Each structure stands twice: as structure tokens, then as C-alpha cells.
A protein has these predicted regions:
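A ligand-binding cleft/hinge motif common to bilobed small-molecule-binding domains
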Residues: 56, 60-63, 71-83, 128-132, ...
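Extracytoplasmic small-molecule ligand-binding "clamshell" domains
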Residues: 1-74, 78-82, 142-146, 156, ...
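Periplasmic-binding protein-like
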Residues: 15-16, 88-102, 150, 175-212, ...
Length: 266
């Protein structure tokens, strides 16, 4: 990898999703993408994005030294910090328990007993569930082999699980597409969202540059504008639009899904 210097290439690994990276109508978009693009511009570097299909793949890409930065809505953890350098937090989230409206609504941790819980592969929610299971062995969960929160929301929407744990930001964005999936309650803890730096002797230097950028982004309003653009108007999204989209997914997607999946894995 090139060093983070003007004229060089910044390589970022991320995952697909509305809060991270996706292909919009005309160009790439996503909250994390907007930030790393601004970072590349601030450093006068070109940007190359690598998309991982699982959270494990995100960190494997860093471990192999194939990316400078992982910007994928990653929550900070002691386990991850032992392996990689991390930046300061740029977004605070909360873990939320979600369920399908009209079904049983848990209202507290105690209500999770004997429910079928699903989480995203590689997410830090497994750590929290392990702690809960120490207090209550009846707490059980399954891991979905995906890095996309939409797959978790879809599982709840189709009735394939009782509840799921998601980060609050991802849930807010995805609820627009899955209006029948609702928040049951929040876990009373704050999740610090950070970038992780690649496995490289220069990672400490890269961390300083990234932190300088994030500090400036907080001061000059860049971060606030990105938050407003991706999270600010979610609560006002049209439910009719959401149901219309869901109907199109049910009726039109099956015809094209095999081809889409084939191309995605090529």
C-alpha cells in the first residue's frame, strides 16, 4: 500500500448498506463512504473502495494489508483494539432489539428468554448476548452469515426469527424499507463507531491523519451534514413508499435475484 500522501491512492474496505456504502442512481453513496471520500479529498488522494461480504472479511482485508482503512459502521471493542489501531469515535449508536409489528413485543432483557434471536455475522452483539446468557442460560441466538443489516431486517420481516439485535443507525435507515419491523427497546449502552486501520507498521501514522480529519470534520460541520443527510429525515419517510417498495421486491425481484447474486460474487 502507498503511504497516505498527496497523489497516492487511499484504499478503503467497507460493506454494502445504506449507512456504509451503496451504488446510488448516479454514483456511490453511504454515510461512511461520504466521510472517507472527504478524507481522501482532504489528503489529495484518489479513492479505491473494496467491498466485503462479511464483517470477518472486512478485518481479514485489513490483516492482509490490502486496505489502509476499514470504514464499515464498525463499533469499537477491546478485542478489535487488540488487533488493530482505531480512530476516535465519529458516531454514537445504541444496540436495539427489533421485532415484527403485530407479533410478541419484548420490553426488557428478561423478555428475551426462549426467543429466537438473530444477529449479523461478526457483530459485537454476540458479546452482549454472551453476557446475558451468563445471567440467563435460556437466552439463545443464531448468527446470519451476512454483513448486511438488510438481511437481518428481512429475516424478521418474513417471520424467520422472533427478534434481532442491530445498531440504532442501521435500524433507522433500514426501517424505511421494512416498515413492519419495529423497535422493541434499546439496550442501555453506547456504541462508539470508529474506523480501523490496516495491519501495517505505518498504521499509527495513518491513525493520526484520520483523527486529524475527523476532528476537523466535527469542527467544520462536515460530519453533522453527513449525519443529517443520512439519518436526519428517516423518521419522516413515507410509509406508503415503503410498502410500495416491499411489494416490488416480492413481485419483481425473484425473477432477477439469481443473476444479481451471480454477478455480485464474480
Amino acid at each position: 500500500l502507498d503511504n497516505l500522501e498527496p497523489g497516492n491512492e487511499l484504499v478503503v474496505v467497507t460493506r454494502n448498506g445504506p449507512t456504509t456504502y451503496y451504488l446510488g442512481a448516479d454514483e456511490p453513496a453511504g454515510f461512511d463512504y461520504e466521510l472517507v471520500r472527504a478524507f481522501a479529498e482532504a489528503e489529495d488522494m484518489s479513492l479505491r473502495v473494496k467491498v466485503a461480504f462479511t464483517l470477518e472479511e472486512v478485518f481479514e482485508t485489513l490483516q492482509r494489508g490490502e486496505a489502509h482503512v476499514a470504514a464499515a459502521g464498525l463499533t469499537q471493542s477491546t478485542e478489535r483494539d487488540q488487533l488493530f489501531e482505531s480512530t476516535q469515535s465519529y458516531l454514537d449508536q445504541q444496540p436495539v432489539v427489533v421485532y415484527k409489528a403485530g407479533q410478541y413485543k419484548p420490553r426488557s432483557i428478561e423478555d428475551l428468554t426462549d426467543l429466537d434471536i438473530v444477529i449479523m455475522q461478526g457483530s459485537q452483539h454476540a458479546i452482549r448476548l454472551n453476557l446475558l446468557r451468563e445471567l440467563n442460560p435460556a437466552v439463545r441466538w443464531r448468527v446470519l452469515e451476512t454483513a448486511e443489516s438488510s438481511a437481518v431486517m428481512s429475516a424478521i420481516n418474513r417471520g424467520e426469527a422472533d427478534v434481532a439485535l442491530l445498531d440504532s443507525g442501521e435500524f433507522s435507515m433500514q426501517q424505511r424499507l421494512y416498515p413492519r419491523v419495529a423497535k422493541a427497546f434499546e439496550l442501555q449502552t453506547t456504541l462508539n463507531t470508529v474506523w480501523y486501520l490496516g495491519s501495517d507498521p505505518r498504521a499509527g501514522e495513518w491513525r493520526e491523519k484520520a483523527n486529524d480529519f475527523l476532528s476537523a470534520a466535527k469542527s467544520d460541520g462536515t460530519l453533522k451534514r453527513a449525519e443529517q443527510a443520512y439519518f436526519g429525515n428517516v423518521a419522516y419517510a413515507s410509509r406508503i413508499e415503503s410498502f410500495t417498495f416491499q411489494r416490488a421486491v416480492r413481485t419483481k425481484l425473484p425473477k432477477w435475484q439469481p443473476l444479481i447474486e451471480k454477478v455480485a460474487h464474480e
